[in-house]
Amino acid sequence: MKVFSVVGITQSGKTSTVESIIGELKRRRYSVGSVKDIHFEAFAIDTPGSNTYRHRQAGASLVTARGLQETDILYPLRLPMKKILEFYDQDWVVLEGVRDINAPKIVCAHDEEGIEALLDASVMAIAGKVANTGLKEYKGLPVFNPLTQAAALTDYVLAKVPPLLPDFDRQCCGLCGMSCQELLAAIIRGEKEPEDCLLRQNVELHIGGKPVTMVPFVQEVLAKTLTALVSTLEGYEPGKEISLVWQPRKLKE
């Protein structure tokens, strides 16, 4: 899965940029998902007095509204992006307004001051209404008009965005010699490749069908523990793949 975010202030052209890229990706036969981050504090799809609202008021911790055209699962909290992305299996997920993720970003702005306010090492391009000023480049970053340059912008996205990287601190992993955020910035600059991420999952753990990313130390502990348990069993062969599926049962009190 490849993920990137389009960020910017209100009315700077974010949604138009997202629409243009999604449309181009679909025309090129990619599957696409999207996430819209809403910063309006009072925002809620559920409304007081609705049946689903009454379910929640009665004590339901998770409520689902199932209609003929769509199904909405209403979580009563703001989910982290890592959790949200677990629901997606598309080739691409385009985020709008999301900043708290280790992924490349496109900044939309009205002017250069607006660009500068959001500029950091994760930014790979500029787009939105600032393109109407005639600006073609800003500090080495290309500027795209999403309405007239949708194909060129999508070409750039396809060339620049790596598969979603981990998001660990240097102290937690650091196998590549830098933090995950620093590695992303180096990939955007063309100094590193996605393959330079040395966090290889030779031990895979799934909980509830969802993969769990583990740092090398945890992988090693799990591998050594499992190997110690099964190495005494008949049929064990060093170097052969070991698969374990565990369906926990509630213990009797």
What does each model-found stretch correspond to?
Residues 13:
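Conserved glycine(s) of the Walker
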Residues 20-76:
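N-terminal phosphate/diphosphate-binding loop that engages ATP/GTP or pyrophosphate donors
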Residues 70-113:
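Glycine-rich phosphate-binding loop used to anchor ATP phosphates in small-molecule kinases
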